[in-house]
Amino acid sequence: MSKRHFDMICQRHLPLIADRIIGLSLSEHEETPKQINLFYSYLLSFNKFIQLRSLSINGVRSYKILVKITDECHHLYNLTHLNFYNCSLEDNQADFPLLVNNIWSFSKLVHCNFSIDIKGKKFFPIPKKISSSLERLSIYGSTLKLHEINRLFEYTNRLKSLSINVEFDDDNNNYILSLFPTLIELHISCSHQLDISKMISLLQNTPNLRRLNVSLWFNFLDGHQWEQIICNYLPKLKIFRLGMEETLSFDQNIEERVDELINSFRSSFWIDEHQWFVRCIIQKKTIHLYTTSKIFYNYDSVLFGSIRSTDPQDNQQKFYNNMTSIVNETFFDQPIPSYIRLPNIEYLWIKLPINDQFWSIVPSLNRLNSLTVVSYIDTFQSQLKTLLNRAPCLRRLCITQDAPLHSQMLLFRYANPSVRQLDLRDYNHYFNKEECIRLSHSSLGRQCEVLSIMINNRESIIYFIKKMINLRSLNIRCEDEKYYKGLALAKNGNNKYPDEKIQNKDDLIQWLKDHLPSTCLIVRNPHWINYILIWI
């Protein structure tokens, strides 16, 4: 969304319909920086959204904003769904329990996704207020100690669904887990070596569990162990999704270990009674085992021929039909059997020149949404042109190169009518004024909505905004500014946000505010201080 449209919605429409809106989502990222602050500048608070049932907040980096939002939610008496996604706070003085207690005090809240990461605070604080309504809770970015699960349920006594990262090996052994009879769905993950008996003690207290999703890194339970756990403690379980990984030492035989694991999941319990099939994937000395109903994300590191399954209908082609992302640009450099096809690629990183076998393996790019071309040089222009011509749904094009080219002229000749995002920040070149003009008038430039680029003259920013009529967001690095170097020194590797006096010396920001329309929002990129974000 452009800032012009967002301004219009906030100024003209929201005041008239605020009392009828039932769902609202606000997000702060590179394309919409400071969106929530801007929202508050127009509407001051959420108090007018009296019918609001669902509120989603994404990417907030301000503790004060989060406290303000959770305070105002007390007045939203119909709010049942609250989602905080990808919120990251560098302020280690932030009062984590205050945020949690605010949320637990909402009278009708049923569903909460809590993804708030506060620097230096690993563990989720147990609330001190009782929620009589919360039934579904997902916690990301922080960990829950096993011995505190009792207390979580004491303050969330209607909880039916829970998704958490658990630390099973905490030091407190002087506790007995209570029964959790309300719980019917559980998603647990553990990213360290665990005491298996403690995980079993959790599961044996969930007698009404119907859905279980388990992710274990550095831990393995074989099929016999899982069968015993389910039969003894989870009589009502209907859906079971499992993901585990184990890294072997160099003197261990990985093929024998895989055979042992696969065979342990071949009993009638797995195959006949439940039809819960598992798949084993070998990556060097690491074994990934997961139920075929669970998504495995590290596709592009998988060597062909290293897949085993208990499903008689499973095969390598079925596995690769589900592959939608390749972010390893050397993926096609490995030997690939000629019968393998990858028909559903949506996100692709590829290094030029394209391997000879690429087009036989990838027969169609009709679903390709994002393309990153690595080591681009003019010699391979025809290959890039072919990629673009065969990708009718491509939205994002990113071009990276290690060494600068003598000329950028060929870049301006490429075309694809569906591309709306152009990322040249790793192009290893500062575009001069003439090149920026050519880019603005090129086919890709005219249709571009989101542009990331390095330039050597700040005047080109003005030209981009005037001439690229569809542009709504700029992520730009300017060679003729020195502010970010001083800013990096001011941070000294410790503080994420600079001293206010340093911020006030940001000459380029001030220059842009003086020369661009006042409707543009101009800020430093919080993730890359040498880039400036302009929301148009």
Regions found by a protein language model. Give the residues of each.
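Eukaryote-biased activation of long, low-complexity terminal tails and linkers
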Residues: 1-536
